Amino acid sequence: MGWGSVLLLLAVALLCQRASSIGANWGTQASHPLPPDIVVRMLRENGIQKVKLFDAEYDTLRALGKSGIEVMVGIPNEMLATLASSLKAAEKWVAKNVSTHISTDNVNIRYVAVGNEPFLSTYNGSYLSTTFPALRNIQIAIIKAGLQNQVKVTCPLNADVYDSSTTFPSGGDFRANIRDLMITIVKFLSENGGPFTVNIYPYISLYTNPDFPVDYAFFDGNAQPLNDGGTFYYNMFDANYDTLVHALEKNGFGNMPIIIGEIGWPTDGDSNANLDYAKKFNQGFMAHISGGKGTPRRPGPIDAYLFSLIDEDAKSVQPGYFERHWGIFTFDGLPKYALNLGTTNTGALIQAKGVRYLERKWCVMKPNVRLDDPQVAPAVSYACSLGDCTSLGVGTSCANLDGKQNISYAFNSYYQIQDQLDTACKFPNISEVTKTDPSTGTCRFPIMIEPYYGGAAREHGFFFPLLMVAAIAVSIF
């Protein structure tokens, strides 16, 4: 081989290194999660080469074995106290959930995520004293296992751990009440080769602030730019990312690698959570990072994981109904919209293969029942409390349903989640089973997939606050 060919190959290799592949968050807070082997095949067929997990479920990690997919395995916040207080517990966790899967199953575990957004202000400091000790003990356990060159620790943090005293990125620093702790953690990560992992959500800014400029959430350059001393920011992502970069620089860690642990846009549950906006945001983000341009303060490739891969119908809706609709795929692995991930697909996501469904039948309201029947309201409240009614209401995919259709949707959600048990469609004299699909327009009345019993398929109980049930019940009528 001539020198010209060698140089060409080196150039191609360097180019590939600069164009970081996109990853995806794979959450499993679902009443009926897809079998892990089906999800892994879907990941591979869509060219998704990195996956971020929120736990270390055995079957999930086994399915990822020999796939070549890079894995970030997660430790839930609820485990931090135990791992912080016991090095032995940390060693057992690493042995069971990291070492074994690497040596026996050939899983490409590259990171351990210790906790998930543990310093959110809404947690009221619950994990302030346990996060760093847990992080330290897991790192010690990784070193004892001889995996420190392959597996790095990190701690996914919400973007609220830093802010700006000037409202501009250049004023970025860590939040005053946790600044010392953040510097301790960042220093520890830096010493051990771990990245700073941050979750950035322009959608949340739009959801929580009615005055937030919509165009600034996207990447098409239509927003009024933010002028930070001659550096112009045309979208919120760049401004937020560079606020973190300035915070790191200000505290002596300007070269620390950054991973975007979560970024995405939901498709339902709110007027701004829809297919058009989700496609616009996610495709815009992919185009924004595809050339390795980076941000004004930190040029270069951006390492990121889309949030999320699949919808999760058992997630808490405390933040909002949209929480169950972040997936680029539906709960059963159907693509929601065209999306070019810059991998092996050309804009058409490939659906999950081998998905097995329950029988094609639905639970609906009997046509002769009146809306003011005294049995209706309590039945709907019950169905929504144990089902998923987050697609009902103003601005949602099922917003155009009439009263009876809304009630039918609630009944069917409960019926499907209960695996179509006969008793799950026995609302007193007001419900019946039909084999005629009641779906209409943008509103899909789902048929549930067969339950998966290989792992902790039903360990996540539904959390649907009564106030939210009441709010949906009001919107139905």
Curated annotation (Swiss-Prot):
It catalyses: Hydrolysis of (1->3)-beta-D-glucosidic linkages in (1->3)-beta-D-glucans. The lineage of its organism: Eukaryota, Viridiplantae, Streptophyta, Embryophyta, Tracheophyta. GO terms for cellular component: plasma membrane; plasmodesma; plastid; side of membrane. It is found in: Cell membrane. It comes from Arabidopsis thaliana (Mouse-ear cress). Contains two additional disulfide bonds. Its main location: membrane. GO terms for molecular function: glucan endo-1,3-beta-D-glucosidase activity. A lipid is attached at residue 455 (GPI-anchor amidated glycine). Its EC number is 3.2.1.39. It is a lipid-anchor; GPI-anchor. Disulfide bonds join 363-425. Residues 1-21 form the signal peptide. Residues 456-477 form a propeptide. This is Glucan endo-1,3-beta-glucosidase 6. GO terms for biological process: carbohydrate metabolic process; defense response. It holds the Pfam family X8. SMART domains: X8 (SM00768). Belongs to the glycosyl hydrolase 17 family. Coiled coil: none annotated. The active site is at 117 (proton donor), 262 (nucleophile). Keywords: Cell membrane, Disulfide bond, Glycoprotein, Glycosidase, GPI-anchor, Hydrolase, Lipoprotein, Membrane, Plant defense, Signal. The keyword Transcription does not apply. It is an enzyme of class 3 (hydrolase). Glycans are attached at residues 97, 124, 406, 429.
